[in-house]
Structures are given as C-alpha cells and as structure tokens.
C-alpha cells in the first residue's frame, strides 16, 4: 500500500529529528551527569567538608520571677473566700483603667490657659517632653486629681537625648524670639497700605512671568526629606510676610504646630558650621492643640504674633517676642457642657484689625473682638443668637472681601458656594434648623460635589475648587467676562440679589453665581492626603494676581486670575504637597505633605 503525502512528511520529520538528537549527543551528556551524581552520593564521609561552627559564649541568665504565680502562694484570697478584698481589687483596676482612658482623652482636648513655648516642645516621637505640666493643668481645670506619673526612660542614653533635644529646641526658640524682635508694622508698610486699597495695576506679559517662575528651584540647603516640620499629616500651612528672616509654620492632624526658621543656621560654632553633615533645619514643633490645626495666620499690624485655630474649638496666639502661647478664644456648643467643642474650621481677619471672623464645622459664623479678654476660669457659653447660620453642613473655608469688612464668601460640604452681606441679618430662610439667623445672601453656586474652599483677591475675583475636579473663577470687578453688566461687588446694596435664570426662579435656593471659567484639576485626594485648597497671593509685589494649588502628580500649580497657568513646580517633590501657599508678597511657594515634610521653592 502506497504511503500518502501526509504520512511521507511525517516520516521525514521523524528522521530529521533523530539526526538532530544524534548531533547534540544528549545520551553521553546524560550518562556523565548520572556518574557524577552516583559518585557524590556514595562518597565517603571523610571526603566531605565539615562545616565550621563557632561556639557561642554561654551567658548565665539570672533567675527571674515567674510571669504567672499562684494566687494561693501570693496570699490572695479568692472571691468566695474574701469578697470584700476581691471587690476592692476590681474597683482599683477599673479606676486605673478609667484614669488611663481619661488621660488619653485629655491629650486630644485643647490647652487651658497660657503656656511658655518650651513647655509645649515635642520629641521625635510626637510626645510632649513636659507632658506632666500640661496634663496637670488640664486635670486641675476639670477638677480632677492632678497627679500624673512622669514617663521614665529605661536607659540613661534616652535621658541624655531628651536633654539634648530640650537644649536644641530651647536654642531654636531663642532664635525665634530674636527674629520676633526684628519685626515691626513699619517693615510691612507697603503690604498694609495695599491691603486697604484696591490695586488696579495691569498684569505683565504672560511669557515673561512664566520665565520668571521657571527660575524657581527647590530650596538647596537641605534635602526635602530632612525638612520635617510636623509629626503627622499637614493640614495648614503659613508663610510669614517677612522677606529677610523667612518663617514657615505648619499644623498637623494632632494639633502640632511646627516653626521652621528658613534662613537660620542650626550650628553655633564655626567648627560646626564648616561641617555640613551636622547642619540641620532650625525647626521646633509645639503641641498647641488637641485636634486638626485648621488655619494659621498673622494679624496685619502685629507680625510678631501668630494665630492658630483648631477643630478642638480653640484659637490661640503664639507670641514670637515673649515665647508664650495664649488662649484667645474657645467655642463650645450653646447650652452644652464646656468639653463639647464647636470646632473652628477657618479664621480670617477683616479690615478692622481687632476683629476676627471664624466659621465652624457645623456651618455657623462667629465674629470676635480680640480686645475683649477671654477668662479661662469662666465658661464661655455662646448663645444661639451669637452665631449666624450660613450652611447646614461643615464650612470647609471662607474668605473676606479685602476691600470691605462686611462681604464674605463661604464654601461648604453641602455642595454650595455662597456670598453674604453681614450688614443685613434676619431670620434664616434657607436653613432646615429652626430659630436661626443668617445674613443676607447675595447668591449661591451649586456644585456637583462638595466645595472645599473659596478665596477672594484684591481685584474682586473669587476662586474655589472641590471634589467635582474643577477650579472655578468668578469675576465681580464690574468687568464684562460674562456680559452680565453687574456693578462691582463693593457697590452692591445690603439687599441686592443678582438675577437668576427663568428656569431656576421656582427653586427656593437660587443658583445665580456663575464662574466665567473652569479649569480641570484632579482633586481626588483620598483618605491619606489632605484636601486640596486654592489660595490667592495676598499682596503680590509684582502686581500680578495669582493663586496656587497642589497637583496630585506631586507638584504645585500656579495660575493668574484669568485662569492661565504660570508654573508647574515639581523638582525633587517626592509626595503630594497637598497643603500649599505663596509668600504674601514674593514669588516663593511652599507645600506640605502627609508625612509632615515641606517643599520650598525660591
């Protein structure tokens, strides 16, 4: 029978493969491998190399007490034999556990009264070095026994390190005090004058400004990983207006406030200055609050003072001259216990330098005259009439019109941005809460998701951003961005309402604020990164109105007031500098990350 063509090809492939295997000589290789394996497996024990072992010195351990002991041997009677003793032991254990829980709770509360800054210094672990002094003050304030055991270090080496840490922080605070003496209101004459007038200077060429920002570089003196200004995730950042002795201040989620003297050297002697390896940033971290630090600012006419606000309901004043921390104000729920705080979400100063505005986590507004003394021994209960209802949910941030002292804009978790007139206060119309008062609302902007922040510049432009991944710019300078023919916002009457679209007139809450441009921007920070917030430069020396916002791709973006990008700074940025700000007058930028580290561009 003749073979088919397919069978012939198969036979030819078999023959070709056999010839190829013969050429490779695989049989001889397998035989050699087998012989080597057999020789190794049957080799004599003497031919194998023995492993050298080094005898470890025998350490005689001292006989320690057993971890578990019989209650009978210890002389402790059972509950059945002596129920009174058992009840007493149980009561002592419960009391000890309750006291421990109370101390942990007190650590998260605000500070009571005034302190020297050296008492609030923290170590590298974030614990207060003089925690006993602070906790005793808190315990005595609430009427408990003020006996807190001091933490004892297990090794003398740790004691020495603590002493070195105290000396170093004390030296840095002395530097802060020396810098505070150099500040005066006259040093910031131009900023003060410009903050009270509405500048109308034209912007420079866009290309020229971009080239200027191209020259900004990361601060070269230290590695950004070595500039740790806070122990935990940064929630607020402040650049002091000084241009000669620069100070950067940051606050974190646990109430720590870090002060970085940018231009100061950490070494005193010439020998130490010559050794670059020993040079470290001049940073002191203070425990000023018990919860998130929401805002840090400096009064216009008192550059030696720094105001800090927190979710623990307190506002404190840090004096760089006296090296003290004083409680300016504490807010608590109207009619509630003193320890139920009304968290402060933001603070701002108006044209009247003695009055500060603040908003709360519950959507309320409050103003306080700093000339009114705050008595820590008396409970500062707010009446409902003292608070103005602006939103029914958290106010993430607000801004005051720098050209007036009665117009404010608020951004809220309820997905709205609103502009208010504080001159006209009546019964609240748009709140679901009963018996509330609110100022007159000019208008409202509805967003798809929550609005994180809003800021107001000298030329009556507003910027806001939120979780809808948009940066919105509003123009109320009387221009023709939207051809709405609105007068400049400073001329609006106390009952003025911008016109609404016909399709929206039936809605109770108007939607009559319209941005003239929207910029796409990723604001999805997630759980471990602070919320992105855009901020205007308050008094730009170059006359160009600009704002800064962090970029989720580990950088900083700077735009002008028309929405044109001026810079994208990302040199050596290893994390998202979510909380950022510009120097009030100079084109220096700083941003803080979730690990407490700072990136400075100059």
Curated annotation (Swiss-Prot):
GO terms for biological process: DNA damage response; regulation of DNA damage checkpoint. Residues 48-58 have a biased composition (Basic residues). Residues 59-68 have a biased composition (Basic and acidic residues). Residues 35-85 are annotated as: Disordered. PROSITE patterns: WD_REPEATS_1, WD_REPEATS_2, WD_REPEATS_REGION. SUPFAM superfamilies: WD40 repeat-like. Pfam families: WD40. Gene3D superfamilies: YVTN repeat-like/Quinoprotein amine dehydrogenase. Keywords: DNA damage, DNA-binding, Repeat, WD repeat. Signal peptide: none annotated. Belongs to the WD repeat DDB2/WDR76 family. DNA-binding protein that binds to both single- and double-stranded DNA. Binds preferentially to UV-damaged DNA. May be involved in DNA-metabolic processes. This is DNA damage-binding protein CMR1. It comes from Candida albicans (strain SC5314 / ATCC MYA-2876) (Yeast).
């Amino acid at each position: 029978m003749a073979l088919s063509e397919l069978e012939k090809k198969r036979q030819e492939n078999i023959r070709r493969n056999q010839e190829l295997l013969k050429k490779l000589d695989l049989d001889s290789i397998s035989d050699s491998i087998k012989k080597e394996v057999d020789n190794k497996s049957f080799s004599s024990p003497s031919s194998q190399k023995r492993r050298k072992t080094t005898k470890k010195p025998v350490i005689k351990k001292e006989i320690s007490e057993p971890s578990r002991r019989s209650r009978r041997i210890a002389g402790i009677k059972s509950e059945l034999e002596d129920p009174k003793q058992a009840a007493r032991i149980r009561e002592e254990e419960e009391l000890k556990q309750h006291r421990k829980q109370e101390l942990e709770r007190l650590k998260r509360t605000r500070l009571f009264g005034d302190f020297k800054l050296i008492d609030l210094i923290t170590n590298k672990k974030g614990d207060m070095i003089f925690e006993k002094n602070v906790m005793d003050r808190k315990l005595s304030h609430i009427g408990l026994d003020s006996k807190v055991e001091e933490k004892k270090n297990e090794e003398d080496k740790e004691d020495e390190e603590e002493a070195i840490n105290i000396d170093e922080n004390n030296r840095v605070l002395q530097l802060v005090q020396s810098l505070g003496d150099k500040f005066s209101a006259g040093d910031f004459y131009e900023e003060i004058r410009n903050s009270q007038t509405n500048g109308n200077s034209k912007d420079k060429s866009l290309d020229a400004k971009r080239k200027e920002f191209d020259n900004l570089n990361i601060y070269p003196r230290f590695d950004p990983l070595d500039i740790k200004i806070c122990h935990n995730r940064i929630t607020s950042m402040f650049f002091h207006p000084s241009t000669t002795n620069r100070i950067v201040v940051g606050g974190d989620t646990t109430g720590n406030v870090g002060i970085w003297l940018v231009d100061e050297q950490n070494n005193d002697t010439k020998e130490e200055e010559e050794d670059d390896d020993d040079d470290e940033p001049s940073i002191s971290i203070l425990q000023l609050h018990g919860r998130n630090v929401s805002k840090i600012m400096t009064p216009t006419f008192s550059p030696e003072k720094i105001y800090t606000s927190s979710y623990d309901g307190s506002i404190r004043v840090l004096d760089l001259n006296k090296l003290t921390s004083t409680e300016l104000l504490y807010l608590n729920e109207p009619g509630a216990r003193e320890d139920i705080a009304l968290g402060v979400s933001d603070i701002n100063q108006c044209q009247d330098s003695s009055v500060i505005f603040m908003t709360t986590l519950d959507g309320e507004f409050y103003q306080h005259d700093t000339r009114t003394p705050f008595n820590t021994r008396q409970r500062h209960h707010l009446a409902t009439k003292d608070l103005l209802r602006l939103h029914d949910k958290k106010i993430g941030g607000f801004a005051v019109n720098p050209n007036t002292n009665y117009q404010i804009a608020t951004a809220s978790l309820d997905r709205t941005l609103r502009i208010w007139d504080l001159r006209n206060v009546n019964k609240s119309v748009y709140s679901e809460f009963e018996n509330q008062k609110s100022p007159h609302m000019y208008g409202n902007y509805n967003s798809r998701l929550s609005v994180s922040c809003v800021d107001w510049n000298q030329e009556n432009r507003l910027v806001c951003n939120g979780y809808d991944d948009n940066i919105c710019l509003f123009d109320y300078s009387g221009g023709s961005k939207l051809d709405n023919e609105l007068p400049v916002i400073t001329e609006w009457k106390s009952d003025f309402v911008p016109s609404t679209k016909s399709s929206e007139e039936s809605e109770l809450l108007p939607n009559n604020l319209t941005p003239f441009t929207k910029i796409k921007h990723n604001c999805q920070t997630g759980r471990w990164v602070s919320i992105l917030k855009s901020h205007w430069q308050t008094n730009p020396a170059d006359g160009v109105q600009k704002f800064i916002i962090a970029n989720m791709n580990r950088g900083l973006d700077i735009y002008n007031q028309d929405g044109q990008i001026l810079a994208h700074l990302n040199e050596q940025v290893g994390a998202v500098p979510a909380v950022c700000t510009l120097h009030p007058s100079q084109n220096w930028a700083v941003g803080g990350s979730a690990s407490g580290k700072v990136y400075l561009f100059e």
